Each structure stands twice: as structure tokens, then as C-alpha cells.
Amino acid sequence: MTLTSIRRGYHVIKTLLQYGLDEVLPPKMTPWYFTLARSSLFWIRNKHKSKPGGERLKLAMQELGPVYIKLGQMLSTRRDLLSDEWAIELAMLQDKVPPFDGVLARKAIEAELKASIESLFDDFDETPLASASISQVHTATLKSNGKAVVLKVLRPNVEAKILADLQLMSQTANLLEYFLGEGNRLRPAEVIEDYRVTILGELNLKLEALNAIKLRNNFLNSDALYVPYVYEEFCYPRLMVMERIYGIPVSDIAALKAQGTNFKLLAERGVELFFTQVFRDNFFHADMHPGNIFISRDHPENPYYIGLDCGIMGTLSEVDKRYLAENFLAFFNRDYHRIAQLYIESGWVSEKTDLQAFEQAIKVVCEPMFNKPLDEISFGHVLLELFRTARSFDIVVQPQLVLLEKTLLYIEGLGRQLYPQLDLWQTAKPFLEQWMAEQVGPKAMFKKVSTKLPYWSDKLPEFPELIYDNLKLGRKLLSSQQQMLDKYLKHQQQAHKSNYMLITSAVLLICGTLLFNQDATLWSPYVCLTSGVLMWFIGWRSRPKNRKF
């Protein structure tokens, strides 16, 4: 551990204690050695006693800087770990930091391009259009075609700062898991590892560019989503160049109303977009907060979304997708037994879980939701409550499912902000039922067979030879099994014979010893003892050696 990391560690601890976060921990998470360590830092006082715990945590993370702000944003979606009060406070964290000097941005851009900005772009503006914790955005126009573009460039030395903070977080999380029993349930090391993977992905703008290209191709000619064109020839790990868009921020409801936006259609398209990305494309935007979503200015009666910032994308396995779809359908059919089965079958919960106890726990949580009309039931909170319940049964949390839960909460919240009467179930159910029919019905089987047909037809000439080889292998296997069985039986026979001889020798030796004290003929004890020793020797020599079969 370097001197710099020690200083940073002290600053983090000091900040957390100044916000009194040690005081909001439950007693079982504060053993005697924790109390002793806190007492040794007696000069650091809680300066925010009047504020609730969730607000203290939010302010502390805000003060600690960008890496902790992003961690707080991620934790705000983990309501299986945090209370609603704390999660709501963390959701208010804003990833806004002062911009860095435009001259430094120019140098960083030219270092990636290995050329001057003026040789490729006109009207480069050193004043940033937007600034965040990891990157900054500048505007320009392309010399080649005169089109307006934005240049997204990483902050200087941002990687080193993030890696240093991640290392400190990881060490702290490991200590928590080691010392605190409750820490194992909260799995801090797992949370930090998920965060590490997410934030390191955001540090590679070339990867973000490839994600944006893929998402754009998935929705070419779509009425629901537009992804700006990426100029791949100008994209590098620290630089990304893309088409500039002129939309209305989705959070600017007043501007959307002023242009006469069709909010009902917009909200329904948001839900359709989510399910299309997850179930049709298996590639979904996992950072769809309001800052990354704009609405088209043209044709407000037929509006579409404009998606930005593809640094965090999610995918699900085919198995996870099917179980997830079945989960939603089972919930709205109130089939709690099937939900419990699905969690176990999918491997999300251990197969050793008591099915009846798990089913009852799900029922206790979910049944009260049906006191509301269907259009008031939150899809995101259904998924959240199911995962929270499963947590008490040691669910194996899948990072991709956490991303999905976060995205669903964003989309659902956004949809109901745009159109409060949005019936998410009515919009989503036909999509899910159609997708399930395509996956498990006759059409799905025919499609899978059709997909495999070219491979099978290519292998068809080899079938006779494969059958012959398998029969030959089968005969060898049977012969080998018979040989092993013969060896095993012989081994057992030898073992029985040896045991018989050893037991008999023990009996003779005992009898010979007893006869010395009886009125027996002079030679009787010696015959028994000699016979016993001889039989013991024969039995010992005839013992089978240990063999593995």
C-alpha cells in the first residue's frame, strides 16, 4: 500500500465519520474491535447529527467525488440491499463536475488522432458542451462533409484515479466480509466487483462506440429509437466522435408539452423498446437515466427516443431470458409455486432450498400487490421484491440481472412520468406471450431445427462412420467394464479369504492362550498357538493390495 493510497484511505474514513455513518450501522455490524477502532479516531466528530442516514450517505459520496458518486448511483438500484429511504436519496446523486481546461482536451484529442484538430475538423469549440466525471464533450464540424459532430474525450489521468479508488474499495469490502458476519449477507466484495466491471467498461470509448454502432443497427428505420451515427474511423480508447443531435431532454416535460408531444404513444414506445432490446436483440442499454435520453423535435405527434451513452450495455443468456419471461407471466397469474420453481431451476437460488418455504415467502411479499389495479402494479418493483425475497434464501445475484432490474426501474419510472395512466402490463403482456410462444411452441422447434439443418446435412455423410465408431467404442467399453468387474470379484474373493484366515488365527491364538491355564494335554496349547501364528501369516500374505477400479 503506497503513501498516496494511505492518505486517500484516511480521507475516505474521515469523511464517512464526519457524516456519522458509523452511528447508523446496526449493533451486530459493530463488534468490539470496530468500536475500539472508532474510539481511536476520537477527534473526528459527526457534524451532521440532525440529518437522516440516507441523506448523510448521499452527501458523503458527493464529497468523496466521481467514483463514489457513480457507486452511489449504482447502489440506488440495489434495493435488495438498501432500504427504500436510502435508495431514494442515492438516486438523487448527480454525475456533474466542473469541466477541465479546453486546452487540455485539445491536447488529449490530438494525441489520440495523431493529427491536429484543424486538419480534420472545423469550428472546434474549446468550451465543453457537457462535462461528467469520466469524460467531457466538445462540438465541431467535419471537414470532409460539413456535418456537426461531438467529440467525447476522457479526463486526463482519470484511469489512475479510478483504479486507486477501486483498489481501496475492494480492500475495504474484503475486510467487511472477513470481520462482519452481516457483511457476508450484504456481500460488499460482490457489489464492488460488479461496480468495477461496470466503471472500467466506461473507461474505453472505443468499446462504447462499438456498442452504439450495434444498437443503431438493431434499430435502423425504427419508429421508436434513433441512435446517432458513430464515425468509427475517429474512435479510440480515449476518444469517440459521433453525430450531433438536437433533441429535447426527456426530463423537460414543459418543452415536450409545448411542442404537442403524444405522451401516451411515447410512454408505450419506451416499454416496447425495453422488451425489444431484452428479448428480441438480447442487447439492452443499461444506463437509461434521463440525462442519456432525448426526444425528437420533429413530428411530435409521432415522437421517438434518441439514445446516447452506450458505455453500459447488458445481455442475458437464453436460459435467463426464458426464466425471466416465465417469471413475469407466473406473477400475473399469481402462480407462486411456479415462481419458486423457476428461481431454483434457473440456478438463481440453490436447489437445496426448501421449495414450500420459498413459495410461501414469495406469496407473503407479492399477494398484497394485487390489492391494486393491474395498471398501478410496478414491474420493476415486482422484480425487485422477488430478488429481495430470494436474497434471504441465498440467491446467487447475477450482475446482468441487476442491470436489467435497474433499466426496468428507469424505463417504468420514465413511462409513468410521461403518461401516469400507462398500463405497463397491458403493453408488455402481449409481447411476452408472443415471445414465449416463439420460444417453446412448434414454430420455435421448427426454427431451431431449420437453424441446425445446414450443420446436420454437412455431417450426414459421416453418420455411418460415426455409428460404427460408437459401436466399436461401446464394445470396448463393455469389455473394459467386464475386465474391471472380474478384477473386482477376484479382489473381493481374496479379501474374504484373507479375513477368514485372520479371524481363524485370532481364535486359535486366544484358545492356545486359554489352554495354558486349563488341564489340557501338554501339547494342545502349542498346537493352537502354532496353527494360529501360521494361519495369521498366511492370511496376512494373502491380503489383496489396494486397487482403484
From Swiss-Prot:
GO MF annotations, alphabetized: ATP binding; protein kinase activity
GO cellular component, one term: plasma membrane
TM ranges: 499-516, 521-540
KW ATP-binding (keyword) present: yes
Domain Protein kinase: 123-501
Listed pathway(s): Cofactor biosynthesis; ubiquinone biosynthesis [regulation]
Major site of localization recorded for this protein: membrane
Record key words, sorted: ATP-binding, Cell inner membrane, Cell membrane, Kinase, Membrane, Nucleotide-binding, Transferase, Transmembrane, Transmembrane helix, Ubiquinone biosynthesis
Subcellular localization, as worded in the UniProt entry: Cell inner membrane
Active site residues per record: D287
Matching InterPro entries: ABC1_dom, Kinase-like_dom_sf, UbiB, UbiB_bact, UbiB_kinase
One of the GO biological process terms: regulation of ubiquinone biosynthetic process
One matching Pfam family: ABC1
Membrane topology: Multi-pass membrane protein
Enzyme class name: transferase
EC number of the protein: 2.7.-.-
UniProt binding sites for ATP: L129, A130, S131, A132, S133, I134, S135, Q136, V137, K152
Superkingdom of the organism of origin: Bacteria
Function (record text): Is probably a protein kinase regulator of UbiI activity which is involved in aerobic coenzyme Q (ubiquinone) biosynthesis.
Family: Belongs to the ABC1 family. UbiB subfamily.
Protein name per its UniProtKB record: Probable protein kinase UbiB
Organism: Shewanella sp. (strain W3-18-1)
